[in-house]
Regions:
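Chalcogenol-based redox active-site neighborhoods
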Residues: 1-163
Length: 163
């Protein structure tokens, strides 16, 4: 991953599963941001990861009053909407169909199969504080379980705001 904890999070503008625009910089100074990046809607690991994020919201481990929560994938808004409905997800799922955000964050992998290149998102949980600084990057198979990110969201919630 090219970005590291302590780096400023690159801005992005993406569409939600409800075809609304979300811009990361709109949250700067207002809310922490939890990005749960998943590989492919409806796949087993991604379903498990997104359901665990929803459980974190439902249990209060992600304090949504000061933490914005988003799933992010290469899937279309329509695919994400169907995925959210099927799995009872009540947080926005963002579509990075042009791959710009995932590439900027260094979590886009290219695979070559029979001289054809295919790009996939790498599974990751990323927590960005209110100042726009990356506080956690948890990638790979570990990210199926967002427990580390949930704990950090709770910790950031308890810290006094500097804004």
């Amino acid at each position: 991953m090219s970005l590291k904890v302590g780096h400023m999070a690159p801005d992005f503008t993406l569409l939600t599963d409800e075809w609304k625009t979300v811009k990361l910089s709109d949250y700067r100074g207002k809310k922490n941001v939890f990005l749960a990046v998943y590989v492919l809607a409806f796949s087993e690991g991604c379903t498990q990861q997104m359901r665990a994020v929803q459980a974190g919201i439902d249990s209060g481990r992600i304090p949504t009053e000061d933490t914005a929560v988003f799933g992010v994938s290469l899937d279309s808004p329509a695919a994400n909407a169907a995925f959210a409905e099927q799995n009872g997800l009540h947080f926005p799922l963002l579509s990075d169909m042009n791959h710009k955000m995932l590439k900027a964050y260094g979590i886009l992998k290219t695979y070559s199969v029979e001289n054809e290149d295919y790009q996939w998102a790498l599974r990751a949980n990323i927590v960005i504080d209110k100042q726009g600084i990356i506080r956690l990057i948890d990638e790979g198979d570990n990210a199926v379980d967002p427990n580390t990110a949930l704990t950090l969201c709770t910790t950031l919630h308890k810290q006094p705001s500097s804004n």
